[in-house]
């Protein structure tokens, strides 16, 4: 088992691909290559479309790459699968993004949770998966992930990469299905300890900051985050399986004092987002990430 807390910029997405390659290599070095690889010589086609879960719902899933263990990318709050196929530098191109980079050396899949979106030049586009009543919980999302992987025909065990809210989903899935997990990468993952360094008012501000209204996402179909629902689940979640694990944490905070002040002045950030709040959130995040890394 590998324990690691690695600093990297939030959107240096090719770096994520390198770390995924490291996890795959470590898993193979631990004797996991036979169990994590599909049938020798099998060529798997690229796929994109709806996967029928068998319960009246379908989830949009895209997979690329023809060999090696399957990496499953689990996006952050409100983010569609194709957020892994763009970069902050150029949201119109997949060049330098995680999905094609990982597909260059192994099989990779990403999917739309219900209520997720992507921001395009024409505005927000909604999830391509069957809508569900919101708010859905992270354990609902972990169960959906299990149903999706079983229905898709993608072979495990899988290397799971969870960004932000995707981190708790990965942890719950891994705890429930340890034999189906070959490795884990957490990317700025939400943890149960994030609120430990915040006041009750700051925790409430964090939830408001992650609301659809604060982010400009369309109402009615949005994915929603409530710490009061997520934190108890994570505090009680069983230990993850003993597989190679990396905790990847940003070393730069995007909400600097300059960004906060200019955002408030322009009306792009709510009034409750103060420099004091964002500084406290950043400090608490760094501590929480160290605590998360110590769990593995």
Segments the model singles out, each with a brief description of its role:
Residues 31-34:
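Bacterial signal peptide processing site
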Residues 139-156:
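Conserved acidic catalytic loop of the alpha/beta-hydrolase fold
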């Amino acid at each position: 088992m590998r324990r690691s807390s690695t600093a990297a910029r939030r959107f240096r997405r090719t770096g994520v691909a390198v770390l995924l390659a490291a996890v795959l290599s470590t898993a193979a070095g631990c004797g996991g290559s036979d169990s994590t690889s599909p049938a020798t010589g099998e060529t798997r086609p690229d796929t994109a479309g709806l996967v029928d879960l068998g319960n009246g719902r379908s989830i949009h899933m895209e997979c690329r790459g023809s060999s090696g263990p399957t990496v499953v990318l689990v996006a952050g709050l409100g983010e569609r699968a194709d957020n892994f196929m763009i970069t902050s530098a150029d949201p119109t191109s997949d060049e330098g993004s995680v999905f094609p980079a990982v597909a260059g050396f192994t099989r990779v899949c990403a999917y739309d949770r219900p209520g997720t979106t992507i921001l395009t030049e024409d505005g927000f586009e909604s999830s391509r998966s069957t809508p569900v009543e919101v708010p859905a919980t992270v354990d609902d999302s972990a169960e959906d992930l299990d149903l999706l992987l079983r229905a898709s025909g993608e072979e495990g065990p899988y290397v799971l990469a969870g960004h932000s809210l995707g981190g708790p989903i990965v942890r719950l899935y891994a705890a429930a299905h340890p034999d189906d997990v070959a490795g884990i990468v957490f990317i700025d993952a939400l943890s149960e300890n994030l609120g430990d360094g915040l006041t009750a008012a700051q925790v409430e501000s964090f939830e408001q900051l992650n609301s659809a209204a604060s982010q400009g996402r369309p109402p009615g179909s949005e994915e929603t985050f409530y710490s009061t629902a997520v934190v108890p689940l994570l505090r009680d979640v069983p230990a993850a399986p003993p597989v190679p694990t990396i905790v990847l944490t940003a070393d730069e905070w995007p909400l600097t004092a300059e960004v906060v002040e200019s955002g408030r002045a322009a009306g792009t950030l709510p009034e409750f987002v103060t420099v004091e709040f964002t500084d406290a959130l950043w400090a608490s995040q760094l501590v929480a990430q160290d605590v998360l890394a110590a769990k593995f």
